Amino acid sequence: MEQSPRAELEESMQYHHPEKTLAELPGGQEIADEMLAPFFGTDVRTYREIKGAFAERARRCARELLESVRFARFVDRLPFEPGSTVVGLGDSITDDAQSWLEILRHLLAERRPEDGIELLNAGISGDTTSGLLGRFLDLLERDPAWIIILIGTNDVAFVRDPRTKSLVSREETDKNLRTLRDLTEALSEARLVWMTPPPAIEARVVESSSLCEPTWRNADLAEVAKLVRGVAGEDTLVDLWEAFGDPPEPELLLPDGLHPSLAGQRAIAAALVEQLGYRR
């Protein structure tokens, strides 16, 4: 089904954030909405309206989760020290304007506003483990206390025929994941949290992609999830195959079968908080 111009704009703004790239330029720390709106071919008022709607949905998810006294206690027990920096790394699942990390941001704002915990969303749509490795040292310079990694979905993307080369080979994905871990241990005091890429609904993925567009198979995503489990070792591991189910619950994924819906992002945030809060 063809999208309306408004729906296309909202999707573009949901998964693309040019301010992350612009912030790396000299004097680019504060990027005004007046500069960002033209990137999407819209006016400032519409840009702010859509941006605010994403934030409100993430805030609403956080408040709904906090209606559970048990869950609220897990948020209180999250091992993030006051004033610390928590970095979330990954692809569009993290870069999503209403992602698990944005929900986590609102959870902390609701329950622990005085702690001054900084959450840095360093997800980049379309990223792979190779791309993440290329920018990882710059992220370590932010001196994070915690690094949460959810990466690998795009590594196994291929164009229609599964015999074609995936974006990143399994061997390279494994090496990249291990290098991320080794660099963290050697150059940082940060604690690592690993999340497996979630499963997809293959039928939806096939239906929503054209002949020349990348596609995905659950068998390949399962292999990456296995690699993440192997690399995690004694670090905290959040297994999203357990959180989503195998096969995944349909409402947790968008019609494209790959990206988490708002309910899916909420499930990721809940699994992360429960795992970290329980381990403490």
Report the location of each language-model feature:
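Alpha-helical cap/lid subdomain in secreted, periplasmic
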Residues: 2-14, 102, 106, 110, ...
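Short glycine-centered, acidic/aromatic-flanked micro-motifs in structured strand/loop junctions
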Residues: 89-91, 121, 151
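Conserved donor-binding loops in enzymes that form glycosidic bonds
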Residues: 91, 124, 258
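Short beta->alpha junction loops
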Residues: 120-128
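N-terminal secretory targeting modules
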Residues: 1-87, 109-115, 141-142, 186, ...
